[in-house]
């Protein structure tokens, strides 16, 4: 394995007082060529390019009866004869009298579509401020206890979360979606703070952090079988409904509402649903399918207890706040709400800030304080993407102390910084005019984030024991850009850590790119070669496709977070601190 200091998928990265970095071993790197990846490659690695959010153009309503296209050509004298305009390829602007509420000119909260733009950072400052002010107005108008649906100290009813989901599903306004989530989460904090974590996890359609590797792994046919067995309908009827409706969640809502029950089941709770789904995800081994179906039936049998046997019009309000609908959608891995995780981050931040102010007897935080809190929460999550760690910390220490107690740490993979595509190199140079920046090579490989803790430092990172592999050399693992554990795919890399890492190194998190490597010709092989490696149960001695690891960023070193140190400064110093003089 060779170790070189070069690049990831970010072609250009801003750095101050920097110069282009060179390979540690002096070899000339081979540039990667952008190309379409296969489905397997997309699943295993994914692109390092941030997707471009497209914003739908909406026609504005004008009171003038005549609507004309604007032209850049010189204005000609108007003729008294009536003009016959050629049909325009653009959609015609409707007359004011014909405009429906959906077609009206977008207001501030309508300007963004959650299904089209999921990046909260795209919000303009004035739009973000209006969003916060709108949320504050709702808080002031709602009184002391908005939406008091359950008694304080009792478990959060799953029906209450489904009501919030339904409100979110009925709008495409991202700011309104954020308000619904914020107000509900504030209610959870006030009445049942112990259920705050599972509530947030169900909102983002996850049972645990990505690096935990917990997946439901349930196919559509298995879900349909469970719905049929639970509601007494044949599989053929369920399949026919699915073909007609196209949404298995609505099929479940329809089936459950038409099923009479003799005894009313105990209402579902958020924690109960989360634990039930987690139990389904952890089922393995012989007879696992039957056990999963049994777990699904248990949840569906207790769902929608108040409407069971009464029939529900699934064409009204998109099926309404049906518990069965959202349980099945969660099992499918798609809630279909248009609820981005970044929106939930903002909602959590606002709910926490408002709750803390209420406990302290203070006024509702100002727009500036809200914005500062949101930035802190986003920053902490980007560095430590684990709600299991952040949520308990924020409840114990408060939002503004999070940066002190929640920092990047070995064992929890940090999310990668994605590149933002540009149309040309001149656009990049114009954007960075007057600044020094570092250019690096793009390798045709797979992102690899290497975590390491030496044996005598394990006690400093107790959480790492649960996520990193342990051997006589300490704790170590490799994570993908999607936080998937790749340790079983690259045992040859982990097996050689002690041959290129200095013995006095206590801990590090190293961002790298692994590429297929020709050991004889000393050159990078095509990406397709790398994808021929087995993903599981790989033995180092059986590896046929050798790899070269190009290190390009040191995020954490000997207890010190270095993710905010300029890249060029890291490149100049981290090689001599981390690597042996002659990497093997």
Residue ranges and their predicted role:
Residues 1-583:
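N-terminal nucleic-acid-engaging modules of covalent nucleotidyltransferase systems
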């Amino acid at each position: 394995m060779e170790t070189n200091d070069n690049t990831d998928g970010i072609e250009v990265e801003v750095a101050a007082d920097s110069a282009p970095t060179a390979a540690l071993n002096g070899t000339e790197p081979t540039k990667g060529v952008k190309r379409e990846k296969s489905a397997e490659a997309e699943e295993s690695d994914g692109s390092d390019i941030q997707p471009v959010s497209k914003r739908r153009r909406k026609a504005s309503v004008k009171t003038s009866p005549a609507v004309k296209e604007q032209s850049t050509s010189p204005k000609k004298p108007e003729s008294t004869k009536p003009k016959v305009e050629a049909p325009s390829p653009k959609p015609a602007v409707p007359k004011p009298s014909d405009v429906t509420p959906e077609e009206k000119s977008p207001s501030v909260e309508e300007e963004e579509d959650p299904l089209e733009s999921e990046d909260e950072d795209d919000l303009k400052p004035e739009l973000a401020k209006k969003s916060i002010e709108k949320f504050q107005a709702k808080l002031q108008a709602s009184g002391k206890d908005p939406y008091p649906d359950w008694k304080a100290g009792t478990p959060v009813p799953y029906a209450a979360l489904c009501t919030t989901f339904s409100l979110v599903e009925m709008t495409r306004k991202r700011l309104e979606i954020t308000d619904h989530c914020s107000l509900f989460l504030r209610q959870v904090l006030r009445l049942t703070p112990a259920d705050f974590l599972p509530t947030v996890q169900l909102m983002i359609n996850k049972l645990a952090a990505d690096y935990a590797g917990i997946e439901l792994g349930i196919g559509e046919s298995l879900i349909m079988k469970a719905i049929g067995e639970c509601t007494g309908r044949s599989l053929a009827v369920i399949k026919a409904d699915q073909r007609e409706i196209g949404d298995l969640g609505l099929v479940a809502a329809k089936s459950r509402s038409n099923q009479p029950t003799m005894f009313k089941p105990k209402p579902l709770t958020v924690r109960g649903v989360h634990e039930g789904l987690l139990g389904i995800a952890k089922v393995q081994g012989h007879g696992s399918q039957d056990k999963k179906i049994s777990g699904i039936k248990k949840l569906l049998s207790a769902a929608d207890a108040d409407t069971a046997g009464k029939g529900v019009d699934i064409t009204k309000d998109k099926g309404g706040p049906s518990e069965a609908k959202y349980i099945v959608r969660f099992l499918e891995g798609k809630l279909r709400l248009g609820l981005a995780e970044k929106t939930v981050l903002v909602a959590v931040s606002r709910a926490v800030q408002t709750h803390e102010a209420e406990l302290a007897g203070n006024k509702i935080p100002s727009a500036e304080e809200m914005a500062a809190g949101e930035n802190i929460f986003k920053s902490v999550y980007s560095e430590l993407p684990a709600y299991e760690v952040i949520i308990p910390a924020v409840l114990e220490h408060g939002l503004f102390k999070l940066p002190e107690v929640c920092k990047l740490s070995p064992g929890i993979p940090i999310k990668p910084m994605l590149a933002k595509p540009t149309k040309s190199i001149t656009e990049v140079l114009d954007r960075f005019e007057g600044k020094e920046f570092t250019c690096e090579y793009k390798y045709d490989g797979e992102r690899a984030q290497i975590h390491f803790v030496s044996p005598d430092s394990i006690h400093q990172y107790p959480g790492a024991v649960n996520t990193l592999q342990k051997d006589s050399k300490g704790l170590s693992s490799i994570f993908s850009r999607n936080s998937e554990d790749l340790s079983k795919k690259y045992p040859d890399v982990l097996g050689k850590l002690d041959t290129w890492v200095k013995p006095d190194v206590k801990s590090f998190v190293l961002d790298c790119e692994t590429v297929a490597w020709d050991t004889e010709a000393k050159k990078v092989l095509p990406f397709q070669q790398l994808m021929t490696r087995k993903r599981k149960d790989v033995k180092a001695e059986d590896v046929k496709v050798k790899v070269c690891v190009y290190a390009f960023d040191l995020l954490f070193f000997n207890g010190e977070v270095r993710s905010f140190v300029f890249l060029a400064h890291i490149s100049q110093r981290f090689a001599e601190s981390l690597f042996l003089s002659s990497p093997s």
